[in-house]
């Protein structure tokens, strides 16, 4: 144990000794010097860049020069830390300028050294030595500039502090220097070690040699980067330090007289002619300046003497004085301001270890404030308990106190006769500065009695006593001068004042250094009394001067020249701190010398109001040309900051809002009145705590914040001014007059007298006066200057208030009868205040109504009936108790208590009995009422019967309506039952005859009972209509029946029910039926809708008739019984039964000579199904064709003209070959002039986009309408040039991928009808919004077109159709000789056309090189064909050119083609019926409904049966069951064609269409030539995103093709080859189109252009240069 104890003691002592030694070593001067030396060596890290650069180049001379320059530069920086003149000399602007110029010169010479070395010849060695010198100076100057580039004075301050505190300064300097040297050596060794290790490895060395040393570009890049970074950092450092330009010094004492003399000379007055007041002012200024001990004149003499003793550095660089102060602390009691030569921090004494030591403390202001607080603070300073010295000292004090206490106690025990008195030392003060008379300080303020840490506040002197002291102590120099110059001075010699000896006790004063000049602000310059200076020296906030009063605009007013008037009208300076207003006017003296000598200049008598904008102004109070580096660090967090804060006090500031971004809160305050209160909580809680004064302060604060917010943002004043003016005009001219008119109309309707004249008289009293932004009113029609930018207020005098009736009231005084207008049209009492509450218009009316209603007691009955009937027993008991309640005011307190106790007991008993009775009462008793309650209810019902009559009437009316509805429903059910029975009777009568039974089945038009009928007939899809029609046609054959029924003899034996049935469906018509038929009432609008079909009206107008169509449908359903019975007679079958019917009956007899046309059949049957009723049922008339009786069906021209489902699947088609008289059938009864096409049934999928041509040309509205003259030829005549057309156009056709339609049901027999799935729900096939998403420029044109369309009439296009010629030609071409002759002619024509093609193509290439080859071929072919054929037959030439451009004939068979081919046939049939075929064609191809790959290719010149047999055409062609139908040619959707079309658009001015005299006379549809070629550029046509997508997709996908198909053949390979040829031929043109018109000089700008990131702010960065095209085409 002892050993362990000894070990612990030894270890503890060793630890204490070692820790003390280590602490001494660490706190020693040597360690501190080593620490700061290493810091100075390693702090400047950027200076080693050039050293590493020299080491890498492996040149020993360069390496040595770099190291020496680095060490010398570091040494200079180290010495500048310890020597203040050197430190400031390196920071002076002049030294920086010299060093930077030398550095730039060295770099410039070093960079151009290699280029100029060859020209020197023999002086090459000296040049190389100069290169070494450049490297040395580079490293040296960079070290000296490093403190300026990266300024940080922390290290220098810390070193200065330690030098000030330590005693052994030389030891500190030596240790720091040695540490710096060791640090430099370590840095150099580390650099050599890293570079040497890398050089030893061959791989690293080879890489360095390959990419760095041998690569000259690397050094050039490094030099450029280093030079640019150095230049930027140098400019940044110049922003922190003053410019090295001599600033203009301010005027001092010697220049005051010169300034005055110059001004007097300008005014034409000699120096002798000065007034006495000016001399006094100058002498006063001179005396005040001469009295300053540190004025510049005296300092110059003293400095000349001291300059000899100062060092050379201090001579060159004056580091103690600058030309300008940063802040100018003004003092109005002195002429010049005090110079603040103290630094930001200073040294003060603080207690440390019980001793006062000098420490590095806080600023001076805080130390002075701390002294003032500590003098009166009562908190005791507790000593440091860890300090042993202070602990021992306190213990000694306690021991001494204990001894004294013990001694006193012992002395008290001694019995001594002497009375001891307690002697106390007290503090006393002299009475009235008399040392003989003293008085004690009060005990509460005496520190000797009450203890330490107490003080006494010094009593201030009275005001009169202060004035007496000031008169005695003030110097009487001016009074003595007056007495000396006065002749009557002898009268004062006997004055007793001379005999008195006035002793002036000079107080202890410190001579404060002052500036030798007086600086003024801009406001002082304006308000200067006389001779204002040329310019102000102190910056002020930017102010806006507003003219308040201009006397020139008021000529009737007298000019106010008197001083009294001037002083009354415009004061010198009035400032309103709340509104930041300053009213200023330049003052003039009474005895101005200019008034006597010179002419009177025009005085500016305008009264101005200066307003300061709420903006961050950190330059406020700064002196011009002062050094900004003296500014302390500031922190700016908010968007708008009026006052800056230091980092020390920034977090302690009061946060105004909950948001860090205060601009959002200010924006909220602009538009929402009273929103500033809602920043920290609810208004209710805050308003309860606030007093009236606090509320007023809060309101003023809010108003100031709103005003500042309006003035902070840009363009807010413009917005606010416009809103105020518009609100003023709306209020005065529109709103209030309209309200007055409405009020008086209401009064007239209520049979009261109108008050129109009185209201308008009161409205005329309301005047709107424009005011300045601060509320200064101007004239009624006079707006302030620049009111849009500087702001405006509108003041309303005697505002108008609308009342239900006018009452005479006392008028308010003019001081109260006004308000200000807000941007929302409301009224406020103050500017930017809360809107005041206006008296409600209905309030007096409602109060009067309330008083009248209270007298009537209308609601008494309803109040009694609140409780349900089941609780009537409880209610009765409570009512009985309520009658016995005592009145509290009739009894005393004792009686009240007794009554309360009795009442509580009674209530308890009653409640118990009620609960028991409630259990016993049954449901029957609950429903029954007592006699008493029934009497009450009867009485109340009788009393309230009169006001309740209106309610009863309404109730009875509702019951009546319900009764009628039920009756109608019952009658409808009865009608249905009767109809069913009648249908059964008809079925029984028809069952005898099998034929009649078939007829009954076939004409079953009734819908499924479960299916709901369509409410809008105009929106029915054609697929659904044709589905019902196909069922109707498949049920019977009308061929034999119509001829029987139309005979009057046989029709007698037919039952009248059957006659009515067939007559209703339009199959027969008799005179008896005509008499018996009920004429349906059709209104005029319905007839108008028939005449004007849906396709002729605007879609906007068409859908507005939806409600009328609904009513029309209801009226149809509510027809007479007979029509309902006849209509519903065939309603027993369902749609499910129709699915099971045999489709074989659809095929008609093949031996029939003539069949109906597809469009003819669909029009008739669809009209019979949907629009069966007519205004006048007409007899059966013949169709335009020469048809038989069995096909005679009524026809209506304006029926639905859609051609989609005109032909069923298995119906035979008439071959029209060789019969030209029926060529016109599809075009006669078609409505070509239809203006609109409903896109509701077309499915557009925008997911798969297709590049198509422009849907609507921009210049379509300005086209002139002309006519074409076409002739329709026979198919055989047109087939001879089909081959030529197809050969030229088929290259642009590409196969498409067929998409399997999942909507169709393969098992359904009628799947061909619903091939698009149009009758399914719209949720499965949503129709997209066809608002031309790719071309937003056309939306407005589309809407205009809907309202007022511009459509070409078909008569203009087909005006001269010569069908007789065609018939004569067919009759003449019966023989074979004529056929052979025509063949030879056509062959010769084709050969001539080919020869002319080659010639014209060569000519076209020379004329227009920018045209594409495909375009030239197409144009020249049309020219040749028209020129050749115009000689024979010009109309035939027009037809052929038209057919080549727009038509192609597709071979269609019925049994051989697959389903995909039949789909194409259906779509193409629809396209033939449409005028605007492009849109439907594109949509069908987009949805992959139309497959262009299956179109047959016919490579023959003439199609005959012999030729068909030779090429192996199937037998179905021999049977003459082939139909050649035209459809619009679609050109491939690839991007190449789109580029071709866009190029064609851009080259419209170069295209020359062939014309001749006949075509000019007949007229051709042409487009106006657009001279503005910029509109054809894709950037101008397309939207911003779409044009970017278009270019990128075309560039990426122009070589991609979709040739995959289930039915792909070897033809796809041919198509690819031909497309490749087109691509090679048009490659130059496409590249020209893809390449933009403007190229950018760098890649970043190119990326910014393609990805649309160049907005307005970045557009200035772009460098755009227009180039010529790549080639000349």
Swiss-Prot record:
The chain crosses the membrane at residues 32-52, 70-90, 93-113, 130-150, 170-190, 218-238. The keyword Protein transport applies. GO terms for biological process: protein transport. It is found in: Plastid, Chloroplast inner membrane. Residues 562-586, 1120-1135 have a biased composition (Polar residues). Keywords: Chloroplast, Membrane, Plastid, Plastid inner membrane, Protein transport, Transmembrane, Transmembrane helix, Transport. The keyword Transport applies. InterPro entries: TIC214. This is Protein TIC 214. The gene is TIC214. Residues 264-302, 547-611, 1120-1146, 1370-1433 are annotated as: Disordered. PANTHER family: PROTEIN TIC 214 (PTHR33163:SF40), PROTEIN TIC 214-RELATED (PTHR33163). Involved in protein precursor import into chloroplasts. May be part of an intermediate translocation complex acting as a protein-conducting channel at the inner envelope. Its main location: plastid. Part of the Tic complex.
């Amino acid at each position: 144990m002892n050993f362990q104890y000894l070990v612990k003691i030894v270890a503890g002592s060793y630890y204490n000794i070692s820790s003390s030694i280590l602490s001494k070593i660490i706190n020693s001067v040597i360690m501190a010097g080593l620490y700061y030396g290493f810091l100075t060596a390693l702090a400047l890290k950027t200076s080693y860049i050039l050293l590493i650069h020299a080491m890498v180049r492996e040149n020993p001379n360069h390496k040595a020069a770099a190291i020496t320059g680095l060490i010398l530069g570091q040494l200079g920086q180290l010495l500048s830390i310890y020597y203040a003149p050197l430190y400031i000399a390196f920071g002076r602007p002049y030294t920086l300028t010299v060093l930077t110029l030398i550095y730039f010169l060295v770099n410039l010479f070093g960079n151009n050294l290699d280029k100029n070395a060859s020209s020197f010849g023999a002086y090459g060695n000296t040049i190389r030595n100069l290169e070494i010198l450049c490297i040395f100076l580079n490293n040296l100057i960079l070290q000296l500039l490093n403190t300026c580039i990266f300024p940080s004075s922390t290290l220098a301050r810390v070193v200065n502090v330690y030098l000030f505190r330590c005693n052994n300064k030389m030891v500190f300097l030596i240790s720091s220097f040695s540490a710096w040297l060791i640090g430099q050596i370590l840095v150099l060794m580390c650099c050599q070690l890293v570079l040497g290790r890398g050089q030893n490895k061959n791989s690293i060395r080879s890489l360095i040699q390959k990419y760095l040393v041998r690569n000259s570009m690397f050094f050039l890049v490094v030099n450029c980067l280093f030079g640019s970074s150095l230049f930027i950092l140098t400019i940044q450092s110049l922003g922190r330090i003053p410019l090295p330009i001599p600033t203009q010094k301010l005027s001092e004492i010697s220049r005051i007289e010169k300034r005055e003399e110059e001004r007097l000379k300008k005014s034409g007055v000699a120096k002798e002619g000065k007034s006495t007041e000016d001399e006094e002012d100058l002498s006063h200024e001179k005396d005040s300046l001469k009295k300053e001990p540190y004025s510049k004149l005296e300092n110059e003499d003293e400095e000349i003497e001291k300059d000899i003793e100062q060092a050379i550095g201090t001579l060159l660089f004056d580091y103690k004085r600058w030309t300008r102060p940063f802040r100018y602390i003004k003092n109005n009691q002195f002429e010049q301001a005090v110079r603040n030569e103290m630094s930001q921090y200073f040294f003060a004494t603080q207690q440390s270890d019980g001793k006062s030591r000098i420490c590095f403390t806080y600023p001076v202001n805080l130390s002075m404030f701390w002294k003032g607080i500590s003098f009166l603070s009562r908190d005791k300073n507790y000593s440091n308990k860890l300090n042993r010295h202070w602990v021992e000292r306190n213990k000694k004090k306690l021991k001494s106190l204990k001894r004294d206490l013990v001694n006193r106690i012992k002395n008290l025990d001694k019995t001594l006769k002497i009375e001891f008195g307690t002697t106390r030392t007290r503090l006393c003060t002299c009475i009235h500065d008399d040392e003989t008379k003293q008085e004690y300080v009060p005990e509460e303020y005496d520190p000797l009695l009450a203890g330490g840490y107490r003080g006494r506040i010094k009593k201030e002197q009275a005001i009169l006593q202060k004035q007496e002291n000031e008169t005695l102590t003030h110097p009487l120099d001016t009074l003595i001068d007056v007495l000396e110059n006065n002749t009557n001075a002898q009268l004062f010699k006997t004055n007793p004042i001379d005999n008195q000896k006035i002793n002036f006790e000079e107080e202890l004063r410190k001579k404060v250094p002052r500036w030798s000049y007086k600086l003024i602000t801009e406001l002082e310059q304006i308000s200067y009394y006389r001779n204002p200076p040329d310019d102000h020296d102190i910056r002020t906030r930017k102010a806006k001067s507003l003219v308040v009063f201009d006397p020139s605009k008021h000529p009737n007013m007298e000019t106010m020249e008197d001083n009294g008037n001037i002083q009354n009208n415009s004061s010198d300076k009035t400032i309103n701190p709340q509104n930041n207003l300053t009213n200023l006017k330049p003052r003039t003296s009474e005895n101005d010398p200019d008034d006597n000598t010179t002419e009177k200049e025009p005085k500016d008598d305008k009264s101005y109001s200066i307003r300061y904008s709420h903006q961050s102004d950190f330059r406020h109070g700064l002196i011009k040309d002062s050094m900004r580096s003296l500014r302390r660090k500031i922190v700016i967090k908010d968007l708008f900051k009026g006052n800056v804060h230091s980092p020390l006090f920034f977090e302690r500031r009061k946060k105004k809002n909950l948001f860090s971004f205060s601009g959002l809160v200010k924006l909220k305050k602009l538009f929402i009145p009273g929103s500033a209160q809602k920043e920290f909580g609810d208004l209710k809680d805050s308003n309860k705590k606030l007093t009236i004064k606090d509320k007023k302060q809060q309101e003023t604060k809010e108003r100031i914040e709103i005003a500042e917010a309006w003035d902070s943002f840009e363009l807010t004043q413009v917005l606010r001014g416009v809103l105020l003016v518009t609100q003023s005009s709306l209020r005065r001219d529109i709103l209030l007059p309209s309200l007055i008119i409405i009020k008086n109309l209401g009064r007239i309707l209520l049979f009261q007298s109108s008050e129109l004249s009185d209201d308008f008289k009161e409205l005329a009293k309301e005047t709107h006066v424009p005011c300045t932004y601060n509320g200064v009113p101007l004239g009624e029609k006079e707006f302030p200057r620049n009111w849009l930018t500087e702001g405006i207020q509108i003041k309303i005098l005697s505002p108008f208030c609308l009342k239900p009736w006018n009452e005479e009231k006392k008028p308010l005084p003019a001081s109260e009868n006004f308000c200000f207008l807000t941007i929302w049209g409301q009224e406020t009492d103050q500017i930017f205040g809360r809107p005041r509450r206006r008296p409600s218009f209905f309030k007096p009316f409602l109060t009067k109504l309330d008083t009248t209603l209270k007298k009537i007691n209308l609601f008494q009955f309803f109040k009694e009936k609140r409780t349900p009937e089941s609780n009537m027993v409880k209610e009765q008991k409570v009512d009985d108790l309520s009658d016995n309640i005592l009145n509290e005011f009739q009894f005393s307190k004792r009686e009240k208590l007794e009554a309360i106790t009795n009442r509580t007991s009674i209530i308890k008993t009653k409640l118990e009995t009620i609960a028991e009775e409630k259990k016993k009462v049954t449901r029957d008793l609950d429903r029954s009422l007592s006699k008493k309650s029934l009497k009450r209810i009867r009485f109340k019902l009788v009393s309230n019967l009169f006001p309740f009559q209106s309610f009863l009437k309404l109730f009875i009316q509702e019951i009546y309506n319900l009764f009628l509805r039920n009756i109608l429903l019952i009658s409808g059910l009865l009608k249905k039952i009767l109809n069913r029975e009648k249908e059964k009777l008809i079925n029984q009568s028809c069952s005898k005859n099998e034929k009649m039974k078939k007829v009954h089945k076939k004409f079953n038009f009734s819908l499924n009972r479960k299916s709901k009928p369509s409410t809008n007939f105009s929106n029915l899809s054609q697929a659904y209509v044709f589905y019902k029609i196909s069922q109707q046609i498949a049920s019977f054959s009308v061929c034999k029946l119509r001829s029987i029924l139309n005979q009057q003899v046989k029709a007698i034996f037919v039952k009248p029910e059957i006659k009515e049935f067939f007559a209703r469906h339009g199959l027969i018509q008799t005179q008896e039926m005509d008499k018996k038929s009920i004429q349906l009432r059709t209104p005029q609008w319905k007839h108008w809708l028939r005449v004007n079909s849906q396709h002729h009206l605007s879609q906007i107008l068409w859908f507005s008739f939806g409600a009328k169509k609904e009513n029309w449908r209801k009226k149809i359903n509510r027809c007479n019984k007979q029509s309902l019975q006849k209509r519903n007679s065939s309603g027993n079958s369902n749609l499910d039964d129709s699915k099971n019917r045999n489709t074989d009956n659809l095929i008609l007899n093949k031996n029939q000579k003539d069949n109906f046309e597809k469009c003819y059949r669909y029009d008739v049957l669809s009209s019979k199904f949907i629009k069966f009723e007519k205004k006048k049922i007409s007899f059966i008339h013949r169709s335009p064709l020469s048809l038989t009786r069995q096909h005679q069906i009524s026809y209506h021209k304006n029926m639905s003209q859609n051609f989609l489902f005109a032909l069923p699947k298995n119906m035979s088609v008439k071959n029209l070959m060789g019969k030209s008289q029926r060529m016109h059938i599809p075009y006669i009864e078609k409505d070509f002039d239809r203006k609109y096409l409903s896109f509701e049934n077309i499915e557009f999928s925008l997911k798969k986009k297709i590049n198509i041509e422009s849907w609507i040309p921009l210049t379509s509205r300005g086209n002139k309408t002309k006519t074409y003259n076409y002739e329709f030829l026979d198919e055989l005549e047109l087939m001879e040039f089909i081959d030529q057309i197809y050969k030229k156009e088929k290259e642009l056709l590409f196969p498409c991928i067929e998409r399997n339609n999942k909507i169709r049901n393969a098992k359904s027999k009628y799947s061909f009808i619903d091939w698009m799935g149009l009758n399914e729900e719209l949720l499965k096939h949503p129709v997209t919004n066809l608002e031309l998403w790719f071309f937003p420029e056309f939306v407005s044109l589309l809407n205009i077109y809907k309202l007022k369309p511009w459509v070409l009439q078909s008569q203009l296009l087909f005006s001269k159709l010569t069908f007789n010629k065609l018939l004569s030609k067919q009759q003449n071409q019966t023989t074979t000789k004529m056929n052979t002759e025509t063949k030879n002619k056509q062959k010769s024509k084709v050969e001539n056309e080919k020869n002319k093609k080659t010639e014209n193509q060569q000519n076209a290439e020379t004329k227009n090189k920018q045209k594409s080859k495909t375009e030239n071929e197409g144009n020249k072919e049309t020219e040749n064909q028209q020129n050749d054929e115009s000689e024979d037959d010009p109309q035939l030439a027009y037809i052929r050119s038209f057919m080549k451009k727009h038509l192609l004939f597709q071979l269609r068979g019925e049994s051989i083609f697959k389903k995909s081919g039949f789909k194409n046939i259906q779509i193409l049939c629809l396209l033939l019926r449409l005028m605007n075929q492009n849109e439907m064609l594109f949509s069908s191809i987009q949805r992959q409904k139309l497959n262009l790959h299956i179109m047959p290719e016919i490579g023959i010149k003439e199609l005959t049966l012999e030729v068909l047999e030779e090429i192996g055409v199937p037998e179905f062609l021999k049977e003459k069951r082939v139909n050649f139908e035209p459809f619009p040619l679609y050109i491939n959707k690839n991007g190449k064609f789109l580029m071709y079309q866009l190029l064609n658009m851009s080259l419209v001015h170069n295209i020359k269409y062939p014309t001749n005299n006949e075509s000019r006379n007949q007229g051709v549809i042409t487009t106006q030539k657009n001279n503005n070629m910029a509109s054809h550029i894709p950037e101008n046509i397309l939207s911003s995103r779409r044009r970017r997508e278009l270019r990128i997709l075309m560039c990426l996908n122009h070589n991609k093709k979709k040739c995959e198909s289930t039915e792909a053949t070897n033809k796809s390979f041919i198509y690819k080859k031909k497309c490749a040829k087109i691509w090679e031929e048009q490659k130059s043109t496409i590249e020209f189109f893809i390449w933009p018109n403007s190229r950018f000089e760098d890649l970043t700008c190119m990326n910014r252009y393609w990805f649309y990131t160049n907005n307005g702010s970045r557009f200035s960065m772009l460098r755009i240069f227009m180039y010529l095209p790549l080639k000349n085409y």
